[in-house]
Amino acid sequence: RISAIATPQGEGGIGVIRISGEHALKTAGKVFEAKNGKPLVLAGSHHAVYGHIVDEKGQVVDEALALVMLAPHSYTVEDVVELQCHGGLMTLRKTLELTWKAGARPAERGEFTKRAFLNGRLDLSEAQAVMDIIQARTETSLAMAAGHLTGHFSKGIHAMRHEILGMIAHIEAAIDFPEDEVDDVLTYDIQKNVVEIRNRIAGLLQTAHAGRILRDGLLTAIIGKPNVGKSSLLNSLLREERAIVTDVPGTTRDSIEEYADVGGIPLRIIDTAGIRATDDVVERIGVEKARSYVKEAALILALFDASRPLDAEDEEILKLVRGRDAILLLNKDDLQPVVTAEMLQRHVKKEVPVITISTRTQDGLEELTKAITAKVYAGTQAGQEGTFVTDARQAEVLRQADEHLAAAIRTIEADMGLDFISIDLRSAWEKLGELTGETVGEDIINEIFSKFCIGK
């Protein structure tokens, strides 16, 4: 049996200690005394019992509720007790230590969810989605994680595996009864079905870019020369006054990093120092950091002042974004414009959007949101996030499964025989099973759950 704090550590109204495994009720009963005097093992499943946490000497540590969930009707499919105390740091630590003295051991990272997976309550994709739900930063990210948790992604994988297994069964039947002479018809049907499954895999792989961004965020650098409105843009995207805004160039000397919800997409925004030549040592460090962030960023928002002619500093910004995924923003369009979007467009490729905005009046921000959304969802359909590929491992497994299916088609075209086709199909079937956890190795399972927090 294992135990851990299941709520964020710190001060709060409620803190939860979770205990799971054989004799979980016995362990909880050693640290919890019910107000009604009845042993906790007599409590019914999904009943909350009021009482107190007590130490070895019978001294009260805190008042608490014990929530009992008996196997198999619990998160882990094991007996589970959740001790709900007050959310003080010392209270939770003391209670946790008492559960260890009572026979539990400290839970490893993600061990509760790992047990739910090993006990068949969740498949691997659904288990991974638990952490994604916890870390979701936008409603769209949450919808994607919830879709995985409720099996929308897995359903498609199970369907493909079922169809592949059906093809394998037909091949094996044809091998066992060769007198039927259906090889040509069978291989034609198999090739047609394999092509259809490969198309589905290709569709899933198209979602990998958007899925990764919705899960991890899009690293976005805001760059421009000093006093062009970078901090004002950050504040507008965050909908709060996060960065200091003044008319003094060089106010932002270091980089500011924040997450913003832009059209449901989590942007990990870095507001950089204004890029210019400077003798100020501190500002120069900030400028160098800004240049390094430009290299790392997946998206660059480059700001230019519409009310002033382009100068050498603006030319430097244009050089930095050349060949990068960027959106050019012409700020201060509420003032008398000197630079137009058409003038700025001449300096970059046609596919680089140029948007006129005003961080003072918020004009153009909706168009910016649409441009970012279009970049993220390119080739995919918004509203289907529950079936998106969400991480690099899933994408790689799908690519490898597709390679096995492509090999099956080559085998058919080379007329190499049913045995060889079956080998390729079975390899694809096993590879797809790694997504749901049905054919995955223990090392991969351990790696996935090691990224979870303790208590989940």
Where in this protein do the model-derived segments appear?
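Alpha-helical scaffold elements adjacent to nucleotide-binding pockets in ATP/GTP-utilizing enzyme cores
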Residues: 98, 293-296, 316-317, 371
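A glycine-rich (often HGG/GG-containing) alpha/beta subdomain
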Residues: 1-143, 147, 151, 327
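Short alpha-helix of the ABC ATPase nucleotide-binding domain corresponding to the H-loop/switch region
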Residues: 249, 275, 283-287
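Glycine-rich, N-terminal phosphate-binding loop of Rossmann-like dinucleotide-binding domains
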Residues: 19, 85-87, 237, 272, ...
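C-terminal-of-GTPase-core extension/linker across diverse P-loop GTPases
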Residues: 1-5, 9, 51, 139-261, ...
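Conserved beta-strand segments of alpha/beta enzyme cores
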Residues: 105, 266-268, 353
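Inter-motif core of Ras-like GTPase G domains
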Residues: 283-307
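Switch I (G2) and immediately adjacent beta-strands of P-loop GTPase domains
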Residues: 50-62, 66-70, 250-278, 296-299, ...
